[in-house]
Curated annotation (Swiss-Prot):
<dbReference type="InterPro" id="IPR003593">
    <property type="entry name" value="AAA+_ATPase"/>
</dbReference>
<feature type="binding site">
    <location>
        <begin position="1233"/>
        <end position="1240"/>
    </location>
    <ligand>
        <name>ATP</name>
    </ligand>
</feature>
<feature type="domain" description="ABC transmembrane type-1 1">
    <location>
        <begin position="279"/>
        <end position="556"/>
    </location>
</feature>
<dbReference type="GO" id="GO:0140359">
    <property type="term" value="F:ABC-type transporter activity"/>
</dbReference>
<dbReference type="InterPro" id="IPR027417">
    <property type="entry name" value="P-loop_NTPase"/>
</dbReference>
<dbReference type="InterPro" id="IPR011527">
    <property type="entry name" value="ABC1_TM_dom"/>
</dbReference>
<dbReference type="GO" id="GO:0000324">
    <property type="term" value="C:fungal-type vacuole"/>
</dbReference>
<dbReference type="GO" id="GO:0042626">
    <property type="term" value="F:ATPase-coupled transmembrane transporter activity"/>
</dbReference>
<feature type="transmembrane region" description="Helical">
    <location>
        <begin position="1135"/>
        <end position="1155"/>
    </location>
</feature>
<dbReference type="GO" id="GO:0055085">
    <property type="term" value="P:transmembrane transport"/>
</dbReference>
<feature type="transmembrane region" description="Helical">
    <location>
        <begin position="490"/>
        <end position="510"/>
    </location>
</feature>
<feature type="domain" description="ABC transporter 2">
    <location>
        <begin position="1199"/>
        <end position="1431"/>
    </location>
</feature>
<dbReference type="GO" id="GO:0005886">
    <property type="term" value="C:plasma membrane"/>
</dbReference>
<comment type="similarity">
    <text>Belongs to the ABC transporter superfamily. ABCC family. Conjugate transporter (TC 3.A.1.208) subfamily.</text>
</comment>
<feature type="transmembrane region" description="Helical">
    <location>
        <begin position="1105"/>
        <end position="1125"/>
    </location>
</feature>
<dbReference type="GO" id="GO:0016887">
    <property type="term" value="F:ATP hydrolysis activity"/>
</dbReference>
<feature type="glycosylation site" description="N-linked (GlcNAc...) asparagine">
    <location>
        <position position="1218"/>
    </location>
</feature>
């Protein structure tokens, strides 16, 4: 009642006022003025002064406007109200305390810096003032009890009225101060991030996230709908992040844990920002036992006159505590996840930046990818315990103190059990880190071979390795699962420890207390003591569980941080060259080497020795040598990628264009690959395109140069890949198109033109590298590793390497010919005349098309979670889930029911002390022991049985989907996206999903059990439980519509990030050559910034859910207390206490449910992606393709195409058109044509890698469209263009993957291909395959050895010899002739000189079969093949041999005629009787001559004819042969035992090709 108290009752500290004022339910005015007025005002004065000093120098960001004016106008009446209060307080006779004047003066003084700060903050900050907002908010709450107290004191009616008026004005000021200033901001400072605008109240209540939630609930979200983030959560644009700077200052980077200090220093203020809300959270949580005790005591003594007033205040206290828990928990967690997001941005950027500077030959792609995915995610996952670790220690200490007050020495039991759990958890954590590393290493090995398979899918299918690789990768997955089970067994122990404390602590403590207590009312275990202790035990269990889990998670995070530290601490790449980027003269050489020894690292044996050479500016230098002699190493030395052990290499240019041996493309359009980030210059672009022979390809492609080439160019032919990808600007192997367009003056080509057809090769060489090519016109310096030795006359300088790694000879072509006679066999004396209209290509108009657009957002983002759950559940039989849920239900009952048991026990003690004590204790122990047993049984059954099965099945489904996908899928899908499913998605499914499912089920079952206990204990609340459940369902449904999309978008946003990272790792040498590292860093930061948006916003909406559900619990508690107070006289105190104890537990369970559910839904996003991928990816296997071929299939070796037309994607646009031909057993057939003519497509149809729209392909008379595709590929031996080497596998596994042959046969085969000497010095067949083990040509020989060991009678070479030197090519051709003499051979090739002795040639153009005849037949008449052959390096040799043979035949005829004339002159001397013997002797003489000349003389018997020479016959004979074909009897097999023409040609060709070697 107003005016019922005197000032004397308030003029002391109190804090509680006497019973005369509200029955003692109030604080004293003295206490309130000290803590609710003076302390806030003094704090504001100090904080506002400091803030004004800091912000006054900031730039003006916001205009004044009405908001600024109104705030200052309202501040004036507020200041006046404080002056009026001071005036009234200072009047004599006005009741006041000793602190009243000081309090009022400080409140008035606080308005001065407050006003100035409002002015500064409005103009110089985008956000509302945090200091002003917090002060106004807190003092508004404090003014409520102050106004109430002043109102009750006699003689202060006017003061109270003024005070209330000032409070109202303060409320208006708070509204204005928190008002956003978005429309008043100057344009140059406008920020799209909503958190840059929102004030502290908005952010604490998460109002800023509501627009995103409403939009996500209504429609599908796109990337444009996502909020932008503050700059602090994005990677630093310059890469100078705070973590980087602190890391650079670390002296001992090899020390374990060295990464922790830089992170702590970099984010110290962000970490400290979460301390205060976490302390508030702890304070509010610890307040719950006091509320329970006060409530139980209130209802025990409900008949007191002040009970109703106390009950009302108690409801307010519940509102304050549970509302505070909701806001403080959400705020503390939000601050934590902000730090996690910042840490992720910094670490990913650091790993990427380090990857640009690492040594290329040491670069482990799988290890770096694992750091980017698994380790980063594990660190961020464990980062949520940043504040929980230290806060749990504080909470545990307070809880133990309160338990000691309740149970005396029995309160010691929890600390003993807790200590045991903690020590055990620490030991487990130490073991967990080691086992986790073993698991991650297993993941790394599986991901590495999966990435390799995805990057070589065409070769995998052609080689028939699909099933083998599926089994191998699945076996690695099973090994990985076994490794994970060792780690998961420790997780089970951690879960057991977390719940062991919950089960056993109250049992032990209550047993000790009950056994030692007497029968006095203040000693027994009564309701108030028992229920308060139960509340404390529940909280203590939560604190211990959090501490134990945080210790384990922190240990795992530290292990991952150490792995990142090891990577960052690696020695960076050091350029051993002397690079001079300053201007130079025309006479300054581009590259100089002086007695250089080259090796991979210091201390190793050198690979190249005593190199001295000089690459002149604007010259063409060609490097030649035998396979494995070090040509590629020499080029890498010029690039600075290989160490110069001795000597000096000087480079007078800062950028080089490098083109490696393998065609390498980014997943972008053709134009993007050529431009590489350079501005688009249409005339120059068209000129470059024409020079590289791409204009025809553009016209044949529907989208022109906007066609997406796919990962590694799988959608292009081998030749198209080489001409596009080998000059790729962005990521893959660079080649001429990119190099020319980029303007780099020095180009290094490592056998970049291999694999092109002769016409295209001639075109590119002439237009780019020829005497009048673009390189000459643009004054470029070109260094070219080549096997096309017929090009040597064009070189300004030649470097020939010896097999021992030294320079055999160098100089001009003429110099080399003089110094080494056999080099003359490499090329003709003069370059051939090149039939071109113009040496400088005419610019062409490039086809334009709509730009390639990404696929729209998948419907899977909004798909039903029910389907995802069902998909996951169906991975194991249903009875396993029934057993699991049954075990879980029993355990939850054994954990929840003991609280009811203790309540019954306490109620008995209230009525009769220590009644049935032994029985109560015994049953209590039974519940605890059984609960522990069922917990372990539940965890073991799920983690070791169900999880292992689901992991295996999901990976098997995913892998089977990928290996069965058609080639069109790999052409249109980025390999990084697919690999993301095997790394990121499976990581979530393996690491986070199992524990999330276990803990979510546990929390859900506990929530249900606690709600049942609450309903039974407080009967009137039962009616509100359905409403509460309904509210939960509505909130959950509303939340899930957005979070489901965000979690999918978060995973999808990582795919381009990983793709960019893979491109960096694969093209590291190229990127460094072009000095494009910075460009890639910027792209990574842009992709990382985009990835951060869904990542952070998902956390934000999860915190929104946490806040809303905690607020719902607060509302539920208030309803419960309201009903209890309304029915106070009919409510049992112990039953209400039991309900409140379970409310406390329910609050913890809801928090656990939220935390675990958010992890679960994030993990389920990965399951959704796998499910959608498996269901939406088309399989190449058709329904009718189920038959298996007979065991002797391909034994006849016949292949027949009948009217075959085939397509890639669109049946209306066939790429093969009406092909018909038949190949007989043992026949050698070559397939030729220009690049893109359909050669590889023809054999792809045989391997069923493209679809037939009409016609049939038969092998041994069986239509292959009825057979399983893998069976076809396993039966037909295939060698793809790119050698397939399974890195990480042994040589034996690579050479004999099907394990057909014994070791001896494998070794003999390796000896035949010349590779055993390399392996014998290592580990033999057990040598682990690695990139640096073999050169490109040696890898192809290894694949040839694999083909030699395969079973089958049909072998297909798909440009298998395109990238090897002539000697290796000759070796492979000899192996084909000897080892596959009885096989049917189909060879796709551009090297036409190697197939002259084939039985037949198929000439392709634009998918049409133009010609099909023996090669000599086609050469003998005008034909497309003849024109192609004219452009090959064998044409001049062919013509020379033909002329030589024709001349030999002419001389033989002349000799024959002369002999005949001599014979006719002697006939008169020979009698008829002797004539037959003479003729016989002459025949024998000519047979000997015939053998000496290789069987080229017709087997004709000399007969009598006139002495006059038959010149007409000689002319006819010469004409018969001049076409390039011999039609006499002796042209085929070499006559009577003589050497055949093929053998002669092969012998001569081999001698020419082996010149240097």
């Amino acid at each position: 009642m107003a005016g019922s108290c005197t000032i004397d009752e308030h003029n002391h500290f109190g804090p509680i006022v006497g019973d005369a004022c509200y029955g003692g339910l109030d604080f004293t005015l003295y206490f309130e003025e000290a803590f609710l007025s003076i302390f806030p005002a003094a704090t504001l004065i100090l904080a506002a002064t400091v803030r004004c000093f800091l912000v006054r120098s900031a730039s003006l960001k916001v205009r004044g406007g009405w908001l600024h004016t109104l705030k200052l106008l309202l501040l004036a009446p507020y200041s006046i109200s404080q002056l009026l209060l001071l005036a009234f307080w200072m009047r004599s006779g006005t009741p006041k305390t000793d602190l009243t004047i000081a309090s009022t003066v400080l409140r008035f003084i606080a308005t001065l810096p407050c006003g100035y700060l409002i002015h500064l903050q409005h103009h110089r900050s985008l956000r509302p003032s945090k200091i002003i907002s917090i002060y106004f908010l807190l003092t508004l709450l404090f003014d409520i009890p102050l106004a109430r107290t002043i109102w009750t004191i006699q003689g202060l009616r006017t003061v109270s009225a003024i005070f209330i008026a000032g409070t109202v004005v303060k409320a208006l000021l708070l509204i204005l101060e928190t008002w956003e200033k978005r429309r008043l901001v100057r344009p140059m400072y406008a920020s799209p991030a909503p958190e840059d605008w929102t004030g502290v109240i908005n952010r604490s209540l998460f109002w800023w996230i509501n627009p995103l939630l409403f939009r996500g609930a209504r429609t599908s979200l796109s990337v444009g709908d996502l909020f932008h983030l503050e700059s602090c959560m994005l990677p630093d644009p310059d890469g100078k992040h705070r973590v980087v700077m602190h890391w650079e200052n670390v002296t001992n980077k090899d020390k374990a844990g060295a990464m922790v200090v830089p992170i702590a220093k970099a984010f110290k203020w962000d970490l400290l920002a979460g301390v205060f809300p976490r302390l508030c959270q702890s304070g509010f949580i610890i307040s719950q036992p006091f509320l329970v005790r006060a409530t139980v005591e209130l209802f025990v003594y409900r008949d007191r006159p002040d009970s109703r007033s106390k009950a009302t205040l108690l409801i307010g206290a519940y509102a304050l505590v549970y509302g505070g828990i909701a806001i403080a928990t959400a705020t503390a967690q939000h601050k934590t996840y902000r730090v996690i997001t910042m840490m992720r941005a910094a670490l990913v950027d650091m790993i990427f930046e380090k990857s640009t500077a690492i040594n290329a030959h040491k670069n482990d792609d799988s290890a770096a990818l694992t750091l980017m995915s698994t380790d980063i995610e594990r660190i961020t996952h464990c980062g949520r315990y940043i504040h929980d670790t230290w806060a749990s220690l504080i909470e545990i200490g307070i809880a133990l103190y309160l338990l000691y007050n309740e149970l005396d020495t029995a309160g010691i039991a929890p600390i003993i059990i807790a200590f045991g759990c903690t020590v055990t958890a620490m030991k487990i954590a130490m073991m967990a880190g080691e086992r986790q590393n073993l698991w991650i290493e297993a993941i790394q090995k599986r991901v590495a071979i999966t990435a390799e398979m995805l990057g070589s899918m065409k070769g995998v299918k052609i080689s028939g390795l699909t099933d083998l690789l599926f089994n191998k990768i699945q076996a690695l997955r099973e090994h990985e699962i076994l490794a994970s089970q060792k780690f998961r067994s420790l997780l089970i122990a951690v879960v057991g420890l977390s719940n062991f404390n919950t089960l056993m602590t109250p049992i032990v403590s209550f047993t000790i207390y009950a056994m030692g207590s007497g029968d006095a009312p203040n000693e027994i275990l009564g309701s108030a003591r028992a229920l308060t202790s139960l509340t404390l035990f529940n909280l203590f269990a939560v604190f211990i569980g959090t501490l134990v889990e945080s210790i384990s998670e922190t240990a795992m995070a530290l292990e991952c941080l150490d792995r990142i530290r090891n990577y960052l601490a690696q020695e960076a790449h050091q350029d051993p060259r002397e690079v001079n980027s300053s201007p130079v003269t025309e006479k300054t050489p581009c590259i100089e080497a002086f007695e250089v020894d080259v090796g991979w690292k210091n201390g190793d044996e050198s690979i190249l020795h005593r190199l001295s050479y000089r690459i002149e500016r604007h010259s063409l230098t060609m490097i030649v040598g035998a396979v494995g002699c070090g040509k590629t190493t020499l080029v890498k030395a010029m690039l600075g990628e290989v160490n110069c052990l001795t000597g000096k290499m000087k480079v007078n240019c800062d950028r080089m264009a490098y083109c490696g041996q393998d065609a390498w493309l980014t997943n972008g359009s053709i134009r993007e690959n050529i431009l590489g980030g350079s501005p688009y210059d249409p005339p120059w672009y068209s000129t470059v395109v024409a020079a590289c022979g791409l204009e025809k390809d553009f016209t044949e492609l529907t989208a022109g140069d906007q066609t997406a080439v796919g990962s590694k160019g799988v959608s292009l032919s081998g030749g198209q890949k080489q001409r596009l990808g080998s000059l790729d600007v962005l990521t893959r192997a660079q080649a001429l198109a990119r190099a020319l367009y980029s303007g780099v003056e020095t180009i290094l080509l490592d056998d970049a033109l291999s694999g092109l057809d002769p016409v295209t090769d001639e075109h590119i060489f002439t237009q780019v590298l020829g005497p009048n090519g673009l390189a000459r016109k643009q004054h470029l310096t070109v260094v070219m590793v080549t096997h096309a030795v017929h090009r040597l006359p064009y070189a300004d300088h030649i470097i020939a390497l010896n097999t021992d790694g030294t320079i055999l000879v160098q100089g001009t072509f003429d110099d080399c010919c003089k110094r080494l006679d056999y080099i003359q066999g490499f090329a003709i004396a003069q370059p051939p005349a090149i039939q071109m209209k113009s040496a400088m290509p005419k610019a062409v108009e490039v086809t334009k098309a709509a730009p390639y657009s990404d696929e729209a957002i998948s419907d899977a983002r909004r798909s039903s979670d029910y389907q995802t759950y069902l998909y996951y559940l169906t991975t194991v039989p249903w009875h396993n889930w029934l057993v699991y849920f049954g075990l879980m239900a029993i355990f939850v009952f054994l954990q929840a029911f003991p609280t009811v048991w203790v309540t019954w026990w306490a109620r008995d003690n209230d009525a009769q002390p220590n009644k049935n004590r032994s029985m109560r204790i015994g049953v209590y122990w039974m519940f605890g022991v059984l609960g522990a047993c069922f917990l372990l049984a539940t965890a073991c059954f799920y983690m070791l049985k169900i999880v292992a099965k689901t992991a295996s099945v999901i990976h098997s489904r995913l892998l089977r989907t990928v290996v069965n996908a058609p080639m069109s899928f790999f052409a249109s899908t980025d390999s990084g996206t697919t690999l993301n499913r095997f790394s990121q998605d499976l990581e979530l499914i393996d690491m986070e999903l199992p524990l999330a499912v276990l803990q979510t089920c546990l929390a859900l079952f506990l929530c249900v059990a606690q709600l049942i206990i609450i309903a039974v204990s407080a009967r009137y609340i039962t009616a509100t439980i359905p409403l509460c459940v309904l509210v939960y369902c509505i909130i959950g449904t509303f939340y899930m519509r957005t979070s489901r999309q965000l979690r999918i978008m978060e995973i999808e946003a990582k795919s381009p990030l990983f793709s960019n990272f893979m491109e960096l790792l694969n093209g590291l040498i190229t990127i460094r050559a072009f000095n494009w590292a910075e460009q890639y860093k910027l792209r990574n930061r842009a992709l990382l910034a985009e990835s951060q948006r869904p990542y952070y916003l998902l956390y934000a909406v999860q915190r929104w859910l946490s806040l809303v559900l905690d607020m719902t619990v607060a509302g539920f508690v208030l309803v419960l207390m309201g009903i209890a107070v309304g029915t106070m006289h009919s409510t049992n105190a112990s039953s209400l206490g039991l309900a409140l104890v379970n409310v406390v537990s329910l609050s913890a369970s809801v928090k656990a449910l939220i935390t675990d559910w958010t992890v679960l839904e994030t993990s389920l996003g990965a399951v959704t992606r796998v499910k959608h991928f498996a269901e939406s990816t088309e399989s190449e296997d058709m329904v009718q393709e189920r038959d298996l071929p007979p065991e002797d299939w391909t034994s006849r070796g016949t292949v027949e195409y009948k009217n075959v037309s085939a397509f890639y994607r669109d049946p209306s646009k066939p790429v093969l058109k009406n092909l018909s031909f038949r190949v007989h057993k043992g026949e050698k057939v070559a397939i030729v044509g220009r690049s893109g003519s359909g050669k590889s497509t023809l054999v792809s149809a045989l391997f069923r890698m493209i679809e037939l729209c009409e016609g049939t392909i038969s092998v041994d008379g069986i239509d292959i469209t009825t057979l399983r595709r893998q069976a076809i590929r396993s039966a037909i031996i295939g060698l793809p263009q790119d050698p397939l080497l399974l890195e990480g596998s042994t040589i034996r596994e690579n050479v004999d993957p099907f394990d057909y042959c014994p070791d001896e046969a494998v070794i003999n085969t390796l000896k035949r291909v010349g590779l055993w000497e390399i392996l014998e010095s290592k580990d033999g067949l057990e040598t682990i395959a690695s990139p640096e083990l073999f050169s490109h040509g040696q890898k192809q020989l290894l694949c040839m050895a694999k083909a030699m060991l395969r079973h089958g009678n049909i072998i297909v070479f798909d440009e298998a010899t395109s990238g090897v030197d002539p000697e290796t090519d000759e070796m492979m051709q000899e192996l084909i002739r000897s080892c596959f003499a009885q096989h049917t051979v189909l060879t796709v090739t551009h090297r036409l000189d190697t197939i002259i002795d084939y039985d037949r040639v198929l000439v392709m153009d634009n998918g049409i079969l133009l010609e099909s005849d023996p090669p000599r037949t086609l050469l003998s008449r005008p034909s497309v093949f003849r024109e192609l052959y004219k452009s090959s390096r064998g044409w001049e040799e062919y013509e020379r041999q033909e002329r030589a043979e024709a001349e030999a035949r002419r001389r033989e005829r002349v000799e024959k005629e002369r002999a005949e004339e001599e014979l006719r002159g002697r006939r008169g001397l020979i009698s008829e009787k002797e004539e037959p013997e003479t003729v016989s002797a002459i025949r024998e003489h000519w047979n000997v001559v015939n053998q000496l000349f290789g069987g080229i003389i017709p087997r004709a018997v000399p007969r009598t004819r006139s002495r006059s020479r038959d010149h007409s016959a000689e002319r006819r004979e010469s004409k018969r042969y001049s076409g390039g074909d011999w039609t006499g009897e002796g042209d085929g097999d070499g006559g009577d035992g003589g050497l055949g023409r093929r053998d002669t040609r092969r012998h001569l060709t081999g001698l020419a090709a082996r010149g240097l070697h």
